[in-house]
């Protein structure tokens, strides 16, 4: 059963300013929480196109959203191909798009997917099970320098060198096969005082490997650009991020596209061609309420940013 508590449900969907006859995109279908709430607000003319690369999520959505067959189009794909698949559907512009980044609870909670440092399972971490690169390959075959780079860049792990060295020493004896083995190596590499603070000692390294396996940051950056391109004037994009790297991409993109360019001094009116592409709906990110945090601890690190296309 695909059970997943949706984060910032109403804030994200209501922030899109739903038009009942509009066309919307959920780039991260997951447990279908956002999609369900959005579909409930559409008329028979409204449409939702939902992306996911996880077969389990798509099958679950087919079952729970069977009442909305006429309005819902499910696409098995990474959202980096957003424009391509919209074109296939004959869709050139949409009224709203949402992204809920990060791993869905069922992926985290299914040990054999290899995302979780709480279960011993084969090293995997592929969002798309048909993809070739897995966590096992990264851990066992990538060079020491590359491991240090991803642990530091994607995990902001200050003990990156020590952890990469431990991995290198261990894999020379025999391949590292499971998440449990990797967790033990990480714990051995981190000094005891540091292990006792800042959450689970493997959290940052697991995040870094997952981002590398799925090329998450580049994929998101590309997809966000495409999303803004296909929005109608007045259309909105809602983005939920779960760590500072994703949030930085979103914040920077929104800021660049909502800022005025350098203009000659003394212009009485800003020429239309110089008006920024976006208007910020949220100056500061929206975070989960205390009530939501009590029900769903995974919402703690969630940040929601919303922008509207001006032209």
UniProtKB/Swiss-Prot annotation:
Record's keyword annotation contains rRNA-binding: no
EC number: 2.1.1.199
Chain intervals for the UniProt region annotation (Disordered): 287-311
Cystine connections: none
Knockout or disruption consequences: No visible phenotype.
Keywords, alphabetical: Cytoplasm, Methyltransferase, rRNA processing, S-adenosyl-L-methionine, Transferase
EC class: transferase
Compartments where found: Cytoplasm
Gene3D superfamilies (UniProt xref): Putative methyltransferase TM0872, insert domain, Vaccinia Virus protein VP39
Ranges annotated as biased composition (Basic residues): 300-311
Biological process according to GO: rRNA base methylation
Primary residence: cytoplasm
Hydrolase among keywords: no
Binding site for S-adenosyl-L-methionine: 32-34, 52, 79, 100, 107
GO molecular function, a single term: rRNA (cytosine-N4-)-methyltransferase activity
Induction: Transcribed at a low level in exponential phase, it may be further induced in stationary phase. Part of the mraZ-rsmH-ftsL-pbpB operon.
Database matches in InterPro entries: RsmH, SAM-dep_MeTrfase_MraW_recog, SAM-dependent_MTases_sf
Role description: Specifically methylates the N4 position of cytidine in position 1402 (C1402) of 16S rRNA.
PANTHER family named among the record's database cross-references: 12S RRNA N4-METHYLCYTIDINE METHYLTRANSFERASE (PTHR11265:SF0), S-ADENOSYL-METHYLTRANSFERASE MRAW (PTHR11265)
Similarity comment: Belongs to the methyltransferase superfamily. RsmH family.
Name this polypeptide is given: Ribosomal RNA small subunit methyltransferase H
Source organism per UniProt: Bacillus subtilis (strain 168)
């Amino acid at each position: 059963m695909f059970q997943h508590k949706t984060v910032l449900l109403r804030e994200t969907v209501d922030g899109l300013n739903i038009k009942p006859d509009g066309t919307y995109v959920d780039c991260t279908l997951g447990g279908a929480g956002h999609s369900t709430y959005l579909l409930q607000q559409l008329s028979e003319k409204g449409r939702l196109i939902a992306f996911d690369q996880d077969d389990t999520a798509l099958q679950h959505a087919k079952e729970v959203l069977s009442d909305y067959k006429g309005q819902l189009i499910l696409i098995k794909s990474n959202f980096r191909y957003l424009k391509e698949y919209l074109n296939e559907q004959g869709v050139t512009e949409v009224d709203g798009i949402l992204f809920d980044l990060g791993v869905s609870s069922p992926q985290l909670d299914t040990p054999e997917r290899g995302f979780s440092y709480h279960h011993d399972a084969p090293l995997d971490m592929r969002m798309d099970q048909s993809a070739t690169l897995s966590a096992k390959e990264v851990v066992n075959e990538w060079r020491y320098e590359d491991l240090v780079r991803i642990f530091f860049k994607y995990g902001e792990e200050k003990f990156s060198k020590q952890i990469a060295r431990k991995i290198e020493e261990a894999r020379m004896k025999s391949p590292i096969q499971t998440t449990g083995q990797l967790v033990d190596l990480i714990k051995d590499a981190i000094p005891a005082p540091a292990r006792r603070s800042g959450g689970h000692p493997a959290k940052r390294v697991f995040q870094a490997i997952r981002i590398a396996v799925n090329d998450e940051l580049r994929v998101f950056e590309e997809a966000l650009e495409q999303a803004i391109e296909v929005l109608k004037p007045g259309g909105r994009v809602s983005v939920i991020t779960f760590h500072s790297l994703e949030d930085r991409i979103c914040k920077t993109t929104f800021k660049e596209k909502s800022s005025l360019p350098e203009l000659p001094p003394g212009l009485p009116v800003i020429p239309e061609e110089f008006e920024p592409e976006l208007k910020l709906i949220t100056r500061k990110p929206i975070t989960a309420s205390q009530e939501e945090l009590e029900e769903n601890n995974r919402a703690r690190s969630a940040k929601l940013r919303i922008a509207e296309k001006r032209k």
